[in-house]
Amino acid sequence: MDKKVTEIVEAFAQPIVEELNLELVDVEYVQEGQDWFLRVFIDSEKGVEIEECGAVSERLSEALDKEDPIPHLYFLDVSSPGAERPLKKEKDFQQAVGKQVAIKTYKPIDGEKMFEGKLLSYDGNTITLLLTIKTRKKEIQIPMDKVANARLAVTF
């Protein structure tokens, strides 16, 4: 059900976001306590202003109210994905090459499920990371079918 809702919302949101020269990054539909939240993440090369979030929220809300594809009450939240943006689409991974990323896998690889390092390459099937372990550097390859989630990582 939740996946179907996100797919429906993506179909409504994509043309709205494109018309405003923005990018649809992700859609989440989650229950927290007794409340349902529909979160839509947008971005652009220059970042996102609050007015743009408001414009997308208003237009998307009108479209969803008109068609009413979601069976119960929910809170709509349109925002930027933030500094630790999720990496979900092929384009996201390609744009992240050379940047610090955090990868979580479904099952351990070399005894670990969490990896943080520089994304060296992405070929559609495999992520190659450069890990720094104390003073050592280690390259690791992670098959995409083993990736539970991936995001940009903020380093200080």
Swiss-Prot record:
The gene is rimP. Keywords: Cytoplasm, Ribosome biogenesis. Its main location: cytoplasm. The keyword Hydrolase does not apply. Belongs to the RimP family. This is Ribosome maturation factor RimP. The lineage of its organism: Bacteria, Bacillati, Bacillota, Bacilli, Bacillales. GO terms for cellular component: cytosol. Required for maturation of 30S ribosomal subunits.
